[in-house]
């Protein structure tokens, strides 16, 4: 998707989130799962200090059944298994993939929290091609009844399991920066209504919610900070200011550094228009705007693939960045009060989009010089890319 700063006409910032993964459903591992009694999360606190992010079996299965048997270098196996044991988020990115939730919940022990991404708005990812969704503009009722209501029903049936939700990556940030894109104008009402409905309906005692807020290279532009905070705050208030709402998720499926200083693009000609040159600064700066707008402002930050910097020709190049590596592992030790945790939201090894220019879902960002080529369709397993992430991991997994 394309994101532009109104203050810097030369700046073109983009991001996108991969489409559904073909991962098949698996039976939960036989282990002690859930707590003996109902979980009640206090969204006024950082729950990641109490719970460890769960390493879900869907991503584990991709690594154990797709990645490890096909490693070009057997010496990478130990590192691959470390990734399989690392907590990451389960993506509910189609109506059919809601079926992933029940077995995922059934495998979570009491001291862990299941990360779940809710990602199926009508007209999803309105400014990109690689990650368009199944629901068309105007199918909001299907989103509510077949997707969100089903998720809520399953979560209610598992009150003894802690869950952290990331709500609809890329949706509201697109409305802030891509109002000139007709598809985004068409999707706007459904995005706002759908996000508010998701927040209200999934406001459950065992759940803590974070809404997607793009990243520092998106809403971090000086001209985007205030309207961005106001857009997110409107959704929060339209949902009735849900008790289980904690704040924002940043850098989802992204590449931005946590605390690199000066930032990766600090020497660019338009850098003076963006004071948020890393995610740490963005969380602090945008957090102040969120507070002023009347919304909770704590954050989780996706560090799954940001281990290497200086790879992108432009800040907006989002697709399968060549040379990338796994980043900091999930941890509540961020050193910043507003940052609850580093988390792995995007499963490293699942493609961002195809580099085949003849494909229906081809996005030109996946054919950029700094994008890994060849690459398969969004969500498909990308073996060569996974191995590169292992080799370039920082801190090293080798």
From Swiss-Prot:
Keywords: Carbohydrate metabolism, Cellulose degradation, Glycoprotein, Glycosidase, Hydrolase, Polysaccharide degradation, Secreted, Signal. InterPro entries: Beta_cellobiohydrolase, Beta_cellobiohydrolase_sf, Glyco_hydro_6_CS. Substrate binds at residues 218, 318, 346, 350. Optimum pH is 6. It is found in: Secreted. Optimum temperature is 35 degrees Celsius. It catalyses: Hydrolysis of (1->4)-beta-D-glucosidic linkages in cellulose and cellotetraose, releasing cellobiose from the non-reducing ends of the chains. Both N- and O-glycosylated. PANTHER family: GLUCANASE (PTHR34876:SF2), PTHR34876. Exoglucanase that plays an important function in biomass degradation by catalyzing the hydrolysis of the non-reducing end beta-1,4-glucosidic linkages in cellulose and cellotetraose to release cellobiose. Hydrolyzes crystalline and amorphous cellulose but is inactive on hydroxyethyl cellulose, mannan, galactomannan, xyloglucan, arabinoxylan, arabinan, xylan, and pectin. Belongs to the glycosyl hydrolase 6 (cellulase B) family. This is 1,4-beta-D-glucan cellobiohydrolase CEL6C.
């Amino acid at each position: 998707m394309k994101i532009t700063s109104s203050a810097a006409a030369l700046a073109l910032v983009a991001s996108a989130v991969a489409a559904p993964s073909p991962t098949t459903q698996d039976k939960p591992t036989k282990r002690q799962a859930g707590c003996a009694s109902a979980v009640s999360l206090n969204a006024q606190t950082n729950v990641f200090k109490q719970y460890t992010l769960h390493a879900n079996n869907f991503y584990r299965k991709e690594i154990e059944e797709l990645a490890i048997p096909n490693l070009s270098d057997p010496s990478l196996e130990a590192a691959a298994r470390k990734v399989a044991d690392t907590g990451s988020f389960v993506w509910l990115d189609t109506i059919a993939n809601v079926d992933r939730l029940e077995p995922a919940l059934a495998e979570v022990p009491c001291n862990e929290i299941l990360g779940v991404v809710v990602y199926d708005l009508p007209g999803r990812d309105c400014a990109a091609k690689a990650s368009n969704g199944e629901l068309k503009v105007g199918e909001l009722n299907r989103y509510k009844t077949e997707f969100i209501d089903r998720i809520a029903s399953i979560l209610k049936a598992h009150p003894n399991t802690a869950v952290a939700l990331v709500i609809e990556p890329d949706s509201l940030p697109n409305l802030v920066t891509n109002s000139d894109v007709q598809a985004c104008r068409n999707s706007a009402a459904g995005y706002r209504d759908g996000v508010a409905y998701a927040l209200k309906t999934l406001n459950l005692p065992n759940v803590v919610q974070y809404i997607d807020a793009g990243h520092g290279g998106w809403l971090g532009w000086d001209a985007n900070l205030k309207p961005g905070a106001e857009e997110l705050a409107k959704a929060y208030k339209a949902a009735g200011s849900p008790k289980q709402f904690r704040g924002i998720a940043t850098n989802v499926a992204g590449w931005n550094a946590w605390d690199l200083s000066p930032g990766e693009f600090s020497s660019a000609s338009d850098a003076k228009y963006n004071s948020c040159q890393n995610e740490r600064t963005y969380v602090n700066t945008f957090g102040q705007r969120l507070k002023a707008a009347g919304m909770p402002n704590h954050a989780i930050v996706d560090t799954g693939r940001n281990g290497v910097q200086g790879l992108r020709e432009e800040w907006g190049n989002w697709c399968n960045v060549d040379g990338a590596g796994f980043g900091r592992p999930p941890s509540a030790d961020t050193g910043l009060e507003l940052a609850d945790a580093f988390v792995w939201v995007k499963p490293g090894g699942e493609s961002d989009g195809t580099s085949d220019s003849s494909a229906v879902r081809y996005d030109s960002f996946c054919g950029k010089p700094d994008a890994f080529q060849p690459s398969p369709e969004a969500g498909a397993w990308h073996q060569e890319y996974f191995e590169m992430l292992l080799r370039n991991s920082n801190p090293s997994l080798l």
